[in-house]
Amino acid sequence: EADSTTTAVKETYGQMILTDEGIVANTYYYSTSCGVGTTASIWKTVEAQMLDYLKSSRLSQSPENPVQTDDGAVAAGSTEITAETTAEELSEEESFRDFITQTHAEDYEAQEGWYRWTYTVKEIDVDRILETLKNRYEANGKLILTLKDGDYSSQNIKNFSKVTDITIVKRGPGGVADELVIATDKGTYKIISEYNIRAVLCDGVTRVVRQDGSEVSMPSLLPSAFFVIEPSHDKKNMIGYNIIGGGFGHGVGMSQNGAKNMALQGLGAEQILNFFYEG
């Protein structure tokens, strides 16, 4: 138990975050952002439609637009905390690729290990992908679709022995991968939702390399769905893929490391909470 956390708890004891309707808000959080968050729409649930206070925002600071801290001082190199974001721009493939393949010194978490990472699969595990597709289909068949007669629909997954291509075809707010298409020798499948995408592309063996050089095992899920994928081919078939990504977690609500670094810049609890739960 640290003195700083004890103090924070005591100073905010009894405070609540309410929606515009006066209802206690669901304060979702995750570990680390890649410099931008997303919205609850990525979960494809009915409840997500009621969580409009969870915005997709850039977690960055700019010396051109400083913010005052609780004691009236200006936090060096910080930006006014507003609802302005680049989320719409980052939902475009080219813009997101430019964003995620670079680091941005103004981002609050630019020095965190999970801020950027790579995941290089040298030999694709087709059986693992097939098994995961079937498991995710059993969990929710509406989010694992099969291409038939030009349209995607929910159908049982057929066995296949080769993967010919993998492509992100849709991004959600902030650039998170929202729909992935996997082409095989027996059919083409669309995987919907960040969780399913993270599960399907994780082979359980390859280690994630964080930007600080440390390696981490990921047995069942990629760290996040904020990534771009670069397939490697041998003639007509995929033999592997390289992923360049950032962040750890789903990206909805408050980034814990983002909040930590905001506090280190001198921002107070109310300012930080108003940023992440602005709506």
Model-identified regions with their sequence ranges:
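Conserved, single-site charged/polar hotspot
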Residues: 1-279
